[in-house]
A protein has these predicted regions:
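Generic alpha-helix initiation/capping and coil-helix boundary signal
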Residues: 1, 19-22, 35, 158-161, ...
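N-terminal single-pass transmembrane signal-anchor helix
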Residues: 12-47, 57
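Amphipathic, alpha-helical segments enriched in basic
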Residues: 6, 26, 30-33, 37-40, ...
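Residue-level detector of intrinsically disordered, flexible termini
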Residues: 2, 7-11, 25, 37, ...
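Internal low-complexity, small-residue/proline-rich segments
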Residues: 41-322
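N-terminal leader/signal peptides at the extreme start of proteins
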Residues: 1-18, 79-82
Length: 322
């Protein structure tokens, strides 16, 4: 008697057991854990590269401005007091606004009226205030998580209300002391830095050498970032006004604390990018030699660290390796 066989039954495939499935899931999890940091590092490397390119474009724009006008732009314009408006809150355009044409933002430059209208006058007109809130990509580091509008850098005035300006990730280098700017305004003393109110620094004024002088550095949202348009009244608000688009090297890179909004810092691990006066961009380690213990007011040639020396253009001191 013949035995009937079922070919279909013989072809039934064996499935995964629960243990095998768990092993496969574990292998996939391990691969993800190994690959994810590499992917994140690659993305951050791309962001750092874009940040560096942004600063290179800013450097080229600053030098093109110098080529056209014989000086670098002012850190900010010292606005004329308008007593018919009020006696405080005089906002002034900053270095970022002055180089808009060199950054292919000529239309925005003309709409703002940078050459013929003071910023505080523009802010009086409600219809024109949104111009200060336009984000310019070259002023934004892709690692910086800042929102489009910087609500930590607000133009405050009873006459035109509160206006939050567009965020920037870069600040002009104002040396190592805010008071150098006020010293210059009062006594016309040289503040030793690249940017200050009404500054007109020429390349020949950078006697320490353009390759040894910071011009622009990073400012991260974790410490309130910056704005590109300019500053609010720095005479009434002191350094709180100037630090809107300028920074000083009196505190360490990426150092948290109450003084951080005055300093330089980035979202990159280990340091921050700086644009030098010769146009090159270099990543400066947060462990760079730092010493501000003997920064005697009125005597910028006193003993300072390498970091502080790089923030001054004509202190006459040799700069060590960094």
């Amino acid at each position: 008697m013949s035995v009937y066989s079922n070919p279909a039954a013989a072809r039934v495939k064996r499935g995964f057991t629960l243990i095998e499935l768990l092993v496969v899931i574990a292998i996939i999890a391990v691969l993800i854990a190994l690959l994810l940091p590499a992917v994140q590092q690659a993305r951050e490397a791309a962001r750092r590269s874009q940040c560096r390119n942004n600063l290179k474009q800013i450097g080229l724009a600053l030098h093109n401005y110098h080529e056209s006008f014989g000086t670098f732009p002012p850190g900010n314009v010292h606005a004329i007091v308008d007593t018919t408006f009020d006696t405080a809150g005089k906002a002034g355009y900053g270095w970022g606004a002055f180089i808009l044409p060199q950054l292919e933002q000529g239309a925005l430059f003309n709409q703002l009226g940078v050459n013929n209208k003071e910023l505080h006058n523009l802010l009086k007109t409600a219809a024109l205030r949104p111009l200060t809130q336009i984000s310019v990509n070259v002023f934004r580091c892709p690692t910086d998580t800042a929102p489009t509008l910087n609500d930590q850098k607000i133009f405050t005035n009873n006459a035109y209300g509160d206006t939050a300006a567009a965020t920037a990730s870069y600040a002009g280098v104002h040396g190592t002391r805010w008071s150098w700017a006020s010293d210059w305004l009062l006594n016309k003393e040289d503040p030793f830095c690249m940017f200050w109110p009404d500054s007109k620094v020429r390349i020949v004024d950078i006697t320490d050498g353009t390759s040894n002088t910071f011009m622009v550095g990073e400012r991260n949202w974790d410490f309130n970032s910056a704005i590109w348009i300019g500053v609010r009244n720095y005479q009434g608000n002191g350094e709180n006004g100037l630090r809107q688009n300028q920074g000083i090297a009196n505190w360490k890179i990426n150092l948290p604390g109450t003084n951080a909004p005055r300093a330089f810092h980035s979202g990159h691990v280990g340091g921050a990018h700086f644009l030098f006066a010769d146009g090159r961009v270099q990543f400066i380690s947060e462990s760079i030699h730092f010493d501000n213990t003997l920064a005697v007011p009125g005597d910028p040639r006193s003993m300072l660290g390498t970091y502080q020396r790089l923030a001054m253009r004509n202190d006459g001191a040799l700069t060590s390796e960094y």
